[in-house]
């Protein structure tokens, strides 16, 4: 997901390129320079310890912007963690996170600075809002395969992508209609009590409240938006099953969403095993805030990850969808699209 390279006379200070940005996503790392190809790498005229960069031939890349970006990336790749933090601090950027995250953050800072001179970043501003949803559902210890999960908490966190602030939240508990008694395991895991679900509305009633709330926010009409989840299960399993149980058609506005685990793994180049909520927070230098497995608290923490990723230059975009009742991936090569205005789905006949 990134790269390119520059044509500067050997021996001259091409470090000015480092003030501009890093390589675009999708390229390759520049090769390590040989002694005769290298010189000290500089940021704002200051040398980095032992960091070097290479000059490149004019035929390597057609656009000099990307040549400069590639040279910058090579320098950043060879910086120590302390150097990375110092440079990030200098630009008043977040300094928490593991080394790979710090490198990605600094590269994207330089990349954005340079590319802003060429063109506006369409994807960054495409969605005005992101709705983070993390359902809680009935469960039993060991999750036996025959157990039917019913949604018992419906939270939504409204993230403004321009201010990077949580603008509002929605939370409603839901009364289950098949397994009406919560298991001790479920109560302990989620913190949701039997009394809370007994006094709650049924799923169709809660879904109607969610949709009315989203309409008040003018999502899909005045503002472009997308849903975002931590994994595929919230939409492809929990919402899908719940709609069947409640005899509702699957709501069109929930057919496509951003799976932040996929976005995180692709952006920071980490394996799937490193994309659990607590691990993502840890790698970004953050602690979980709130009660784990509280749907609203989980959603707020997912929003914190989304904010950090946007700050680091990630283009959060729809990457999963439901089609004919099946989970499918959405290619990043397709045009970016928004989510339709929320509408209450019809009941099945």
From Swiss-Prot:
The keyword Nucleus applies. The active site is at residues 136, 293. Changing residue 234 to A: Inhibits 3'-end histone mRNA exonuclease activity. Optimum temperature is 37 degrees Celsius. Mg(2+) 1 binds at residues 134, 136, 298. PROSITE patterns: SAP. This is 3'-5' exoribonuclease 1. The lineage of its organism: Eukaryota, Metazoa, Chordata, Craniata, Vertebrata.
């Amino acid at each position: 997901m990134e790269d390119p390279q520059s044509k500067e006379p050997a021996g001259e200070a091409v470090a000015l390129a480092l003030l501009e940005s890093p390589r675009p996503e999708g390229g390759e790392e520049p090769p390590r320079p040989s002694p005769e190809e290298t010189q000290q790498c500089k940021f704002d005229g200051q040398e980095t310890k032992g960091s070097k960069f290479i000059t490149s031939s004019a035929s390597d890349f057609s656009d000099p912007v990307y040549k400069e970006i590639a040279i910058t990336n090579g320098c950043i790749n060879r910086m120590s963690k302390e150097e990375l933090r110092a440079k990030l601090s200098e630009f008043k950027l977040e300094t928490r996170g593991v080394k790979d995250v710090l490198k990605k953050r600094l590269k994207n800072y330089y990349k954005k600075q340079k590319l802003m001179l060429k063109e506006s970043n369409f994807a960054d501003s495409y969605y005005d809002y992101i709705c983070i949803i993390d359902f809680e559902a009935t469960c039993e210890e060991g999750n036996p395969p025959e157990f039917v999960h019913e949604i018992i908490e419906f939270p939504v966190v409204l993230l403004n992508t321009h201010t990077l602030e949580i603008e509002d939240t929605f939370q409603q508990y839901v009364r289950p209609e098949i397994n009406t008694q919560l298991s001790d395991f479920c109560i302990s895991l989620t913190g949701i009590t039997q009394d809370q679900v007994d006094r709650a509305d049924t799923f169709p009633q809660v879904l109607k409240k969610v949709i009315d709330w989203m309409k008040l926010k003018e999502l899909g009409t005045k503002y472009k938006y997308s849903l975002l989840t931590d994994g595929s299960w919230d939409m492809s399993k929990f919402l899908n099953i719940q709609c069947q149980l409640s005899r509702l058609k699957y709501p069109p506005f929930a057919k496509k969403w951003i799976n932040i685990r996929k976005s995180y793994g692709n952006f920071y180049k980490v394996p799937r095993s490193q994309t659990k909520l607590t691990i993502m927070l840890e790698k970004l230098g953050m602690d979980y805030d709130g009660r784990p497995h509280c749907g609203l608290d989980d959603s707020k923490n997912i929003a914190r990850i989304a904010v950090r990723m946007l700050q680091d230059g990630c283009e959060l975009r729809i990457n999963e969808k439901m089609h004919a009742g099946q989970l499918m991936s959405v290619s990043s090569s397709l045009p970016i699209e928004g989510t339709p205005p929320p509408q209450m789905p019809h009941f099945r006949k």
